[in-house]
Regions:
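Short glycine/proline-enriched loop/turn "hinge" motifs that connect secondary-structure elements
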Residues: 90-92, 134, 183-188, 247-250
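Glycine/serine-rich anion-binding loops at beta->alpha junctions
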Residues: 106-120, 202
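Acidic/His- and Gly-rich active-site-bordering loop/insert found
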Residues: 2-110, 130-135
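Acidic/histidine-rich catalytic neighborhood of metal-dependent amide-processing enzymes
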Residues: 115-187
């Protein structure tokens, strides 16, 4: 079977690159749910063509969807699952139209590795196994469109839990380290929200009566930043700040 799989991959190299290019060129972040729905439909069709009983799970138009399914549901073995996401951190046209390109043997473009490349690998893993006559166990897939925002919509988390339930192993198709080492675990993130309140006063004739919330927030931001410890792998990132009313009011 190994030889059959290797031959299939070699014979389909250009098809793999073409699908990779098309997916990367369908740009969009989770901030553009319309783009996520378009990509989800494209992915669902591709996996259906590969034999996967696949569908797009939608909750609302403004919420990025989930693509999930299974091939070989009646096979005797315990299922495995491939997971991932099809959103990126980049807004459309950040790198101009059709940003996918290959230079000196390397591919470039938004999401080319994180993680549209991993989704294309999943697609062709399934195709290669099918071509080789694999019948050992069911293979499930589950991909969301809002991972880069932390899967803020509980719907995606529910779908991942549903499809992963009962699986013997899961393969998250995110890119590994740049040195090609195998990545067996990932550091997750936690989002926090901090409100800082001041005392409103006129900044000209009543300055001492006020307390500037922005100044206090600046101290808090520096304190958070000082919690960084690269040796321990601790990353603190004050990312978004909103505050103030008008220039002459504390």
């Amino acid at each position: 079977m190994k030889k059959q799989i290797q031959e299939f991959i070699a014979q389909n190299r250009q098809n793999i690159i073409d699908d990779w290019r098309d997916l990367v060129n369908m740009e969009g972040s989770c901030r553009q749910p319309d783009a996520m729905h378009t990509i989800a439909d494209w992915l669902c069709e591709k996996f259906q063509q590969a034999g996967v009983d696949c569908q797009v799970y939608r909750v609302r138009d403004e919420v990025p969807p989930v693509v999930a399914g299974v091939i070989g549901a009646d096979r005797p073995g315990t299922p495995v699952i491939f997971t991932g996401h099809f959103d990126t951190v980049f807004d459309p046209n950040t790198f101009g139209p059709n940003p996918f390109r290959i230079e000196d043997g390397k591919a470039y473009g938004p999401g080319v590795l994180d993680m549209k490349g991993g989704i294309i690998i999943t697609l062709y893993v399934i195709k290669a196994l099918e071509a080789a006559g694999y019948k050992a166990r069911p293979i499930r897939i589950c991909f969301c469109g809002d991972e880069e925002a932390g899967k803020f919509h509980a719907y995606a988390c529910e779908q991942f839990q549903k499809w992963a339930d009962g699986c013997i192993a899961g393969f998250n198709m995110e890119t590994g380290p740049v040195n090609n080492d195998l990545c067996t675990g990932r550091k997750w993130a936690m989002w926090g929200h901090l409100d800082v309140h001041g005392v409103s006063a006129h900044s000209g004739n009543n300055y001492t009566a006020g307390r500037n919330a922005l100044v206090e927030a600046a101290y808090k931001i520096l304190a958070i930043q000082n919690c960084n410890d690269m040796e321990k792998g601790t990353n603190m990132n004050p990312a978004v700040i909103k505050g103030g009313t008008v220039p002459n009011i504390l």
